[in-house]
């Protein structure tokens, strides 16, 4: 009931289950409830569940992608964070889908996930030109993970424009 009901008493129960009954968390049905718990109104519970789901295997990814809404709020941000943590570059197409269709918050997480594949250099370079503000800064951050001379050149241009604002 701790994953489906409301009330502050649930935090300790969920925490106890995570710390002491890890075998219970391997039950496929419980994983569905945990994913549902990502939308919990208590952010501490959502965060705790997110961190636990990041320790699971990739078999939960289809559950996380089921009914995924790139325009969604906190629950979808947690889902995307878990997917990128588990799958790294394997879900590269999904990250691009989220960038093209997502809310600003979803886009930011998805842009961050592009760092896992060196093949994303052209896509990231495009983002540094098309995105603005926080998303542009995130694209430049991810560009720092790329081992390509073009990334270095783009960073040089970035700092030459407004050196103190870009630090």
Q: Across the structure, where does each feature detected by a protein language model lie?
A:
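Structural detector for internal amphipathic alpha-helices that build alpha-solenoid repeat scaffolds
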Residues: 5, 9-25, 36, 45-56, ...
């Amino acid at each position: 009931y701790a994953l489906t009901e409301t009330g502050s008493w649930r935090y300790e129960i969920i925490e106890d289950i995570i710390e002491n009954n890890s075998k219970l968390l391997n039950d496929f049905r419980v994983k569905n409830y945990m994913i549902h718990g990502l939308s919990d109104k208590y952010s501490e519970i959502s965060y705790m569940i997110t961190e636990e789901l990041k320790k699971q295997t990739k078999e939960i990814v289809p559950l996380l992608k089921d009914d995924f809404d790139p325009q969604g709020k906190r629950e979808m941000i947690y889902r995307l964070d878990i997917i990128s943590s588990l799958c790294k570059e394997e879900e590269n197409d999904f990250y691009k889908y989220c960038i093209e269709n997502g809310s600003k918050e979803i886009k930011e997480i998805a842009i961050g996930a592009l760092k896992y594949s060196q093949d994303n250099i052209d896509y990231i370079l495009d983002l540094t030109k098309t995105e603005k503000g926080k998303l542009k800064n995130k694209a430049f951050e991810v560009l720092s993970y790329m081992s390509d001379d073009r990334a270095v050149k783009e960073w040089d241009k970035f700092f030459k424009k407004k050196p103190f604002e870009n630090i």
